[in-house]
Amino acid sequence: MGRAVGIDLGTTNSVVSVLEGGEPQVIANSEGSRTTPSVVAFAKNGEVLVGQSAKNQAVTNVDRTIRSVKRHVGTDWTIAIDDKKYTSQEISARTLMKLKRDAEAYLGEDVTDAVITVPAYFSDAQRQATKEAGQIAGLNVLRIVNEPTAAALAYGLEKGEKEQTILVFDLGGGTFDVSLLEIGDGVVEVRATAGDNELGGDDWDQRIVDWLVEKFKTAQGVDLSKDKMAMQRLREAAEKAKIELSSSQSANVNLPYITVDADKNPLFLDETLSRTEFQRITQDLLDRTKTPFNQVIKDAGVTVSEIDHVVLVGGSTRMPAVSELVKELTGGREPNKGVNPDEVVAVGAALQAGVLRGEVKDVLLLDVTPLSLGIETKGGVMTKLIERNTTIPTKRSETFTTADDNQPSVQIQVFQGEREIAAHNKLLGSFELGGIAPAPRGVPQIEVTFDIDANGIVHVTAKDKGTGKENTIKIQDGSGLSQEEIDRMVKDAEAHAEEDKKRREEQETRNSAESMAYQTRKFLDENGEKVSEEIKTKVTEAADAVDEALKGEDIEAIKTAVEKLSTESQEMGKAIYEAEAANAGAADATNVDPNVVDAEVVEDDDKDGNK
């Protein structure tokens, strides 16, 4: 049996860790560094370069060098190299394969298993794609774990305190997450999580690149954005300047021979970027971290003062403006300086690998699903089966029925999001359950089950209880959730909460009215001989009035018609009850009384159920 490792598969850098004697150890790569750039290059001689070697030749091999592929995970993105198309999974797998090789060289043993981390706000498609990348790399993926959760696991197990509330602020190269967790007695439980899958250090780098391009254009009249090689040099310089500005008040960017002018004379770029200017041009990026932070505090139902520790994760948290913002948001609390933001996630992943392999005892990791899951029901309503921030793995079932008589099949449409109307959420997938036995509407019992495994991957099953027929879908298609979609889900859910609630209530009123008219007519057909023609006429007219009201848009008119039908139905029930009581009066009172009561209760219940 081979060894198990923990891998932080990052946007810009990746890290691998292993348990040695029960203690997590970060493994240095073949170049001697504890972090490996998530860069893959295809050299013109056919060699595939990964990590620092790929990054080093990027300027001279721009079109055949791929970086930040994590931002394309879970989409249909591909890149063509030498007439062969590569998916994001294949490119990610190259990085994983290098980490696997370097770990095997360090351990002197085969590495077969891995726990791989993903941003907490990764969608189902993105998690599935990450797992596939691991499989392509020849790894048995034991578990997909959320990055902030892994960080809290690594941080929390070193603490001697019994109960503690930890806030993890994770700003990496391409993604942002914030999670609130409770740790105590070996249990790591996520209370709430939120994030932004399109926000990370790359965006800060790009702002510096844009600033340099504009400065050069103003000074020299040349637009560097049209020169691929120059842009690659600018990206590398921007990253270095950003890192330098974390410890200095200014950074100089000097790039000789960046391009040539119209007369083929070489041009030089030489600019100095101050920390103040850097913070000014990136302020809006920093502001985008506030909404997920506030959302997590709200969802977890805690106050800032209840947070015991703040843990910063991801190299981008080294920027002074970021750590100052976190301090401000948490009421002046100093973030913990005792963890390495680049390595803590991989360390947590190695610990979780140890838990799953039985090497680490008495540790339980309870993660959550970041967005609600449900299906579309009559009227376009989003019926949620699993609410956001539900602990996973989890399984929830609910029984639905048909909307029409003799309906032969049902279409199950699975959505992810927070809006009350299904169409406003993200469609994850759909499937059909056929072979439903002919029956009046409302009779078939269709049980829909949502099952989210510990990796956060969704399985949905629909089963006809009458025939036993079943159909299952594993949600792995679709393009995942873009930043715009996630922003829309959260912001729209807040902005349109009242509108959604009103529409949902209106649809429920319509559904209830339609059902009541149908059930009342059915009851009248079965019991018509027990009531007078006058009562039958009144009930029928009241049911017809409901049908007429349903044709319009006036919800109050529908409610009035339903109240009238309810009144007439009660009169009908009362008449049937009195008739049966009179018929039973000839029997012996002692023997009859209990039976009459039983019969009345059953009949009354049945009657109510049919209204």
UniProtKB/Swiss-Prot annotation:
The gene is dnaK. Signal peptide: none annotated. This is Chaperone protein DnaK. Belongs to the heat shock protein 70 family. It comes from the Bacteria. InterPro entries: ATPase_NBD, Chaperone_DnaK, Heat_shock_70_CS, HSP70_C_sf, HSP70_peptide-bd_sf, Hsp_70_fam. NCBIfam families: PRK00290.1, prok_dnaK. Residues 492-515 are annotated as: Disordered. The modification Phosphothreonine is found at T175. Acts as a chaperone. HAMAP family: DnaK. Residues 492-511 have a biased composition (Basic and acidic residues). Induction: By stress conditions e.g. heat shock. GO terms for molecular function: ATP binding; ATP-dependent protein folding chaperone; unfolded protein binding. The keyword Phosphoprotein applies. Pfam families: HSP70.
